[in-house]
Design a protein with these regions (language model features):
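Active-site-proximal beta-strand elements of phosphoester/diester hydrolases
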Residues: 2-15, 108-118, 149-151
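Extended active-site neighborhood of metal-dependent phosphoesterases/phosphodiesterases
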Residues: 58-138, 142, 169, 174-183
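Short histidine/acidic/glycine/proline-rich micro-motifs that form metal-
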Residues: 50-55, 83-84, 156, 166
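Homeobox/homeodomain signature
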Residues: 1-3, 51, 94, 119, ...
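His/acidic metal-ligating clusters that form di-metal
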Residues: 32-45, 125-185
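N-terminal active-site segment of His-dependent metallophosphoesterases
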Residues: 1-63, 142-144
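Active-site neighborhood of phospho(di)ester-bond hydrolases with catalytic His/Asp-centered motifs
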Residues: 7-9, 45-51, 75-81, 115, ...
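A short acidic, helix-capping loop that chelates divalent metal ions and anchors anionic groups
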Residues: 14-19, 86-88, 120-124, 158-162
C-alpha cells in the first residue's frame, strides 16, 4: 500500500508587499499548509515541486525558510523555472548536491524527484534534464528495488494547453522512453 504524500507546486513566494494576479502568495501557501495539516496529518512527506520563489531572490527563499519552521511534515524542496539555483543554495546551503534531485523510499515505493531547472535555455521557462541528470535517472531507476513514482516541475507529455506545452521538458521524449523502458514506472 502506498503511503500518503503531499505535492504542492508553484508557490511563487514574493516579498511581502508584492501580489501576483491579485493574490498574496505567502498567505495562500500558509493557508494551504494549514489545510494540509488539518486534513492530512497522516501524510508521510511533503514535496514542494518548484517555483518556490517568483523571482528567485534570496529574500524569497528566506521567507520560505521561515514558513518551513512550522511545517509538521518532512519536506523536500525541488526547483522550477522561476527558481535560481545560486540564490537557493545561498539560503539552503545544506543541499550539497549539484542538482536538487534524489529519491525517497516511502513504504514499498521509490519516489524519485527530478531537478528540471534549465538555467541556460533561451526560453528560461522550459525545463531540461542534461545528460548528467539523464544518466542519474537511468541509474536510479535500474537500482530501484521498488516501483517508482517520478516527480518533476516540468511536464513530460503534451497537455493540450499551448502556453504550457511551450515550456514543458525539452527532452521529454528521451525521458519518457527511459521511464517506459525501466518497467518500474
Amino acid at each position: 500500500m502506498f503511503e500518503k504524500i503531499l505535492l504542492m507546486s508553484d508557490l511563487h513566494l514574493t516579498e511581502p508587499s508584492q501580489m501576483i494576479v491579485g493574490l498574496w502568495p505567502k498567505t495562500r501557501f500558509e493557508a494551504c499548509l494549514d489545510h494540509a495539516a488539518l486534513h492530512h496529518p497522516d501524510a508521510r512527506h511533503l514535496f514542494l515541486m518548484g517555483d518556490l520563489a517568483h523571482h528567485g531572490l534570496e529574500l524569497e527563499y528566506e521567507i520560505l525558510t521561515d514558513i518551513l519552521k512550522t511545517v509538521p511534515f518532512r519536506t523536500t524542496l525541488m526547483l522550477g523555472n522561476h527558481d535560481r539555483r545560486s540564490n537557493f543554495l545561498a539560503v539552503f546551503p545544506k543541499k550539497p548536491q549539484k542538482f536538487q534531485q534524489g529519491y525517497l523510499d516511502i513504504g514499498r515505493t521509490r519516489v524519485v524527484y527530478l531537478d528540471t531547472l534549465n538555467e541556460i535555455a533561451s526560453n528560461k521557462h522550459s525545463g531540461l534534464l542534461c545528460q548528467e541528470r539523464v544518466d542519474w535517472l537511468t541509474d536510479t531507476l535500474e537500482r530501484s528495488p521498488f516501483p517508482v513514482v517520478v516527480l518533476a516541475h516540468h511536464h513530460m507529455l503534451p497537455s493540450g494547453f499551448d502556453g504550457m506545452d511551450q515550456i514543458m521538458l525539452k527532452n521529454s521524449e528521451v525521458v519518457a522512453s527511459i521511464l517506459a523502458d525501466s518497467g518500474k514506472c
